[in-house]
Amino acid sequence: MYNSNLLVIQKLLSTNAYLGHRIPTSDFQGYLYGFRNEMAIIDLEKTLICLRRTCNLIGSIISAKGHLLLVNTNPEYNKIIQQMAKKTNQSYINHKWIGGFLTNWKHMKKVKKHFQDFSAHPNLKDAFTSSPFDYFPRFKKMQKCFEGIMTHNIPDCLVIINANQNSMAILEANQLQIPIVALVDSNIPNRLHKLITYPVPVNDDSIKFVYLFCNLITKTVILSKRSQRPKVKVKRL
């Protein structure tokens, strides 16, 4: 077990997952290994523990036929998130969070249906030489919002790649007691950290780690689908 842990930590080291910011927030202190050249160093053993907890949670949700919503606002990670969602058949949002997306879910379902009816209109493509959404700003905004949503049901878990930029998503999920998995860097505000049920302490600016993390979640989802059982209500922590 020790050798296995060591190999994983070496892999994490290669992604620069341990590099924090100069001034970590007080709630993040428990995840620190120390400081080097005035930079916070994240304890990767604790990162590994959090990754295992995350995989256990996601595995149990998928096994119970639950659904994930992947949330990201960093354009650098867009393709990674899209590929992950496609491989796992989960939902994703790769743009700024729309207020009320979760807390006003019934309304959002109606808006989504309106968008789908509009985009599926048989004469729509023939009427425009370019994308019809270019002529309808409202529907172009809807396209960004709904293009990655694969379910009509409210998600069973949020997986957030950049927590600092998604405070509204965190607040809404917390209000509805939806479990939140989030990559948290050393500058995560205390008020947000308290709301995240499954934080993963890490350098969230590392594209190598984000790729590694998404690959891990993808494998967890695929393996868990093989042992799916009738859906049950997942206990909210």
Curated annotation (Swiss-Prot):
Gene Ontology terms for molecular function = structural constituent of ribosome
| Main localization, broad class | mitochondrion
Q: Give the subcellular location.
A: Mitochondrion
Among the Pfam families in the record, one is Ribosomal_S2
GO biological process: one example: translation
What keywords would UniProt list here?
Mitochondrion, Ribonucleoprotein, Ribosomal protein
Task: Establish whether keyword NADP is in the entry.
Answer: no
State the CDD domains in the record: RPS2
- Which cellular components does GO assign to this protein? mitochondrion; small ribosomal subunit
Please give the family membership noted in the entry. Answer: Belongs to the universal ribosomal protein uS2 family.
| HAMAP family cross-referenced by the UniProt entry | Ribosomal_uS2_B (MF_00291_B)
Q: What is this protein called?
A: Small ribosomal subunit protein uS2m
Ranked from the top, the taxonomy reads: Eukaryota, Viridiplantae, Streptophyta, Embryophyta, Marchantiophyta
